[in-house]
Amino acid sequence: MSLEMFDKEIFDLTNKELERQCEGLEMIASENFTLPEVMEVMGSILTNKYAEGYPGKRYYGGCEFVDEIETLAIQRCKKLFNCKFANVQPNSGSQANQGVYAALINPGDKILGMDLSHGGHLTHGAKVSSSGKMYESCFYGVELDGRIDYEKVREIAKKEKPKLIVCGASAYARVIDFAKFREIADEIGAYLFADIAHIAGLVVAGEHPSPFPYAHVVSSTTHKTLRGPRGGIIMTNDEEFAKKINSAIFPGIQGGPLMHVIAAKAVGFKFNLSDEWKIYAKQVRTNAQVLANVLMDRKFKLVSDGTDNHLVLMSFLDREFSGKDADLALGNAGITANKNTVPGEIRSPFITSGLRLGTPALTARGFKEKEMEIVSNYIADILDDINNEKLQENIKQELKKLASNFIIYERAMF
């Protein structure tokens, strides 16, 4: 029996989501379109298999084939990131980070991470996160120019003396200097942990410097710029750290790994290792630069005055409307983005004075410079006349026509 016959409600809602993804433009920087091959194996019989433990050391029988699958995923991950050890079991980036903390430090130890309101992540010590509840947290941020001042980070680190420094961000448009972070960590005897969830796809293509050999441990998601399945990974070059990480993930945080997702990670890594991937990642950055240049030419303020990676962060501190207003206006025109706090923020985190835009998903659909220029100008048109709902509807129809030339999925399920 087909899903349509068995559960038409879920079938119909899934197909409505397919329509939304195909007809609209996805510009949330953390979202992307994965491969049909990834989705195919995620929907396979591998979902049936319990495999607590690690390859060769399972608590259940019948794991000979999933052992081979996980081993293949590990080998591809190590080759991709040029590292010695990899754990591919984390179910998410947040759980990967939780595993890193559990492996390297103890409850009550101090961590230094990027302030959430400056572009950091919940799991980098935010008070509402378990990382801010289990551990004492302190923060560095960006200056008013939107860039990290590494001397300021050094001053904070020397004063606070954290056991672990987290580098990485969810809304930072510039290159992260991992070497400088390692210098600071070494000066105070701290571990350096790099969370590259947002930039991993660029890192493996040589479009952003690698955190290795500087970071003691590196984590990432596998979906954002890597275009794999939703999940997390942890990498290191230190065997002792690797053992602690493995124990922290299982049995510390998780039970049975999701073998259908681990297989999908392996498929995604195969794509990431291809020459085609390097072309894609380069285009992601090129498209982001087109987006940034058009918006600045149209007199919009960008945090840090541009971008080095896959995203731009618009600031509306000089405008009467908020990030939430911009988010809603673009949404009405079929462009999905997200409101975001900015340096010097004057509004609440639920309103914000910024907007985060990313190019990975549009690039996955085949958008290049020409299309990005069109989209960028439409964004500027909408924001220049933010209350004009007729304009928003007209642009929505134009973008729907544009999107129809770049259909990425012919069906909702594989």
From Swiss-Prot:
Residues the record lists as binding (6S)-5,6,7,8-tetrahydrofolate: L116, G120, H121, L122, E240, S348, P349, F350
Gene3D superfamilies linked to this entry: Aspartate Aminotransferase, domain 1 (3.90.1150.10), Type I PLP-dependent aspartate aminotransferase-like (Major domain) (3.40.640.10)
GO molecular function terms noted in the UniProt entry: glycine hydroxymethyltransferase activity; pyridoxal phosphate binding
Keyword Metal-binding: no
Pathway: One-carbon metabolism; tetrahydrofolate interconversion; Amino-acid biosynthesis; glycine biosynthesis; glycine from L-serine: step 1/1
GO BP term (any one): glycine biosynthetic process from serine
Entry-linked InterPro entries: PyrdxlP-dep_Trfase, PyrdxlP-dep_Trfase_major, PyrdxlP-dep_Trfase_small, Ser_HO-MeTrfase, Ser_HO-MeTrfase-like, Ser_HO-MeTrfase_PLP_BS, SHMT-like_dom
Location(s) in or outside the cell: Cytoplasm
Catalytic class of the enzyme: transferase
Pfam families associated with the record: SHMT (PF00464)
A GO cellular-component term linked to this record: cytosol
Keywords: Amino-acid biosynthesis, Cytoplasm, One-carbon metabolism, Pyridoxal phosphate, Transferase
Protein name (record): Serine hydroxymethyltransferase
Higher taxonomy: Bacteria, Pseudomonadati, Campylobacterota, Epsilonproteobacteria, Campylobacterales
